[in-house]
């Protein structure tokens, strides 16, 4: 992934790295591969394991005694109690690269990090694979220089419209792109029922699974359109308050991204309607 060099570079300066992003977007796979590459004996521990999670939540000091740095803590949002103890460790030792963490509930994580680890952690976000990663093209910094962009166009083979739509339908989850899962319909159906519905319940409690599935379908049908809570509420047969709450949840889980309009005026960027 194009982010690999960035993580290794930041690990030379920061004691903690927090990588957020949707589930199954490749966060853990990439960090475990980098752990082998750096060869520091970094331990891997996942808070998806309920026994491990219980210790992290109820006795974070003991957790860090057992799982000594350097350590990779997966799904750290399940135990925000760890952040205070990680802060104490960093303040006492300040060893670059001690803590690598991943999390799939973005805004929920940010609150805990901002309260406890402000200035001590490098925050990174990983989306599913970019088109450049999928085709194996080199990573280049973003630029608006037309000469550079035209040169890049010459390096990448053009594709026809059916191929573009096939890429859209396939999506960019590593499991699909790599061919690990051949049936994409089954993959995405299982993804919704296994991860999304479980995480939604974890965030908001009880949720009507059928209505929420209908809501996700309505949101997906409006990709690249202006966000319209009223229309989404009508399609899912819910009220607008619930529609707004569910949009927030999907954004928190990294399932959707809200693109706010560009404006030199910060206030206008805030109040104008974003696109999904």
Range-by-range predicted roles:
Residues 30, 34:
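Hydrophobic positions on the alpha1 helix immediately C-terminal to the Walker A/P-loop
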Residues 1-11:
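Pre-Walker A adenine-sensing motif
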Residues 27:
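Conserved lysine of the Walker
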Residues 22:
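P-loop (Walker A) phosphate-binding loop of NTP-binding proteins
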Residues 19:
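Hydrophobic anchor at the beta1->P-loop junction of P-loop NTPases
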Residues 107-123, 135-140:
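Short regulatory helix/loop adjacent to the ATP-binding pocket of P-loop NTPases
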Residues 177-276:
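Accessory nucleic acid-recognition modules appended to NTPase machines
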Residues 83-107, 111-116:
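Conserved catalytic/switch belt of AAA+ P-loop NTPases
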């Amino acid at each position: 992934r194009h982010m690999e060099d960035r993580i290794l570079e930041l690990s030379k300066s920061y004691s903690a790295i927090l990588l957020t992003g949707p589930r199954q977007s490749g966060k853990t796979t990439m960090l475990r591969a980098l752990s082998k590459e750096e060869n520091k004996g970094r331990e891997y521990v996942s808070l998806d394991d309920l026994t491990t999670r219980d210790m992290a939540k109820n006795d974070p000091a003991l957790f860090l005694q057992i799982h000594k740095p350097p350590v990779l803590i997966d799904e750290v949002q399940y135990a925000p109690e760890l952040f205070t103890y990680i802060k104490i460790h960093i303040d006492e030792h300040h060893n670059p690269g001690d803590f690598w963490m991943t999390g799939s509930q973005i805004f929920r994580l940010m609150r805990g990090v901002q309260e406890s680890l402000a200035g001590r952690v490098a925050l990174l976000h990983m989306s599913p694979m970019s088109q450049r990663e999928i085709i194996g093209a080199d990573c280049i910094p973003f630029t608006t220089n037309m000469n550079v962009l035209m040169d890049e166009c010459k390096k990448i083979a053009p594709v026809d419209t059916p191929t573009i739509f096939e890429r859209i339908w396939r999506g960019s989850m590593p499991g699909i792109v790599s061919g690990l899962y051949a049936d994409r319909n089954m993959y995405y159906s299982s993804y919704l029922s296994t991860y999304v519905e479980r995480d939604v319940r974890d965030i908001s409690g009880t949720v009507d699974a059928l209505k929420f599935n209908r809501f996700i379908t309505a949101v997906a049908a409006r990709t690249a359109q202006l966000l319209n809570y009223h229309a989404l509420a009508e399609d899912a047969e819910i009220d607008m308050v619930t529609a707004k709450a569910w949009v927030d949840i999907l954004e928190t889980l990294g399932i959707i991204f809200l693109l706010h309009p560009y404006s030199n005026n910060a206030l206008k960027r805030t109040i104008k309607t974003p696109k999904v």
